[in-house]
């Protein structure tokens, strides 16, 4: 694919890769003339030309319109060529709700733009439901911040996983210096915090870390968490749950945990490299129940050879356990995932049926969608949706997905974000991915992040 407009190259590629077939020839040219956005395409020898008009003010709005029309016109060509309509139409960004909020803030109905871009009525309704669920939580305030602690250790690596995580058995030698550096970084970050909205300890599987080391991190977080804000630990796989670790969380004010079975099929769990069974999930819930945590449970649609019936059973079992949150992810195979190396395609129709089932089943059992996001290489061009009982929505997930608060992130592979509302800019500061480099550079990492936040 070639284009004479460099900043559109990736955008147009993202549209093209929505489709299971790709044109052998795809060229694009753009010009703006006499108030019109002209886009011309050559797709496998067929010529297409479009002229669109729209009001804009300033360079930023011009770029947005330029991108919108180019993506829409290419999507229309390929949709007609292959006879396929995508559920999100020409939208390829990972945050549909963020675009919807922007339309609302500029005095427009977001559904008009979404319809124009070919988004299905079902997804327009889903977006509206998410925005409605976020009322009273969504807040733009320059002083707001969320806090992320990275514990990038797991019992083993799942077949579908692309995260930079380390099997705990192979990295125990790094654990003592890593914990010490993480404590130092957490405590040095105290001056960065003004209004703390939430704390999230993730990874990885934080419960893969020994209780003694987990306790050290919780003590350090106590020093920077000066209010009773939401406090989540993504405990993770149910086979690493212990009463000792759960009691530690309760003693340090943690009020929300994540249990991540992904499926209630023992056969599926075996295929994806999990070392636990569905029975371990029930045990983890039983252990957690006496501590009164708000619980999120993760499922993945599209796992190895799962049928709609398998996924339906996982949904039913999840609802039977009655967590406050259920998050339904669609399988997404990125570089670094073993399954991506072994699989050339995902069964998009089956995954789409699973998504449709979750949208029908969960609202009927007291859950509503409160946040969502999309990813590249996602089965069926679908989305990940967090479902919640009313009043139990996760602040951290909303803030991070809508990018409406600074994110102070500590630990290896942690990415801090600074949000500036005046110009809409979001800047990032990434820590080293590997443990050895992180440990060796901890002092410079602390100094750079403090400078990044201007403290």
Listing of model-derived features with the role each one plays in the protein:
Residues 1-106, 388-455:
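Radical SAM enzyme core and accessory elements
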Residues 25, 332, 336, 340-410:
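A C-terminal junction/extension of Radical SAM enzymes
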Residues 39-41, 149, 257-259:
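Short beta-strand motif preference
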Residues 81-88, 105-148, 193:
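N-terminal [4Fe-4S]-dependent radical SAM core
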Residues 142-177:
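Canonical Radical SAM [4Fe-4S] cluster-binding loop centered on the CxxxCxxC motif
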Residues 144-146, 198, 230, 325, ...:
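Beta-sheet entry/capping signal
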Residues 150, 258, 325-329, 398, ...:
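Beta-strand scaffold of nucleotide-dependent catalytic cores
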Residues 165-357:
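Conserved non-cysteine loop/helix-boundary elements of the Radical SAM core domain that shape
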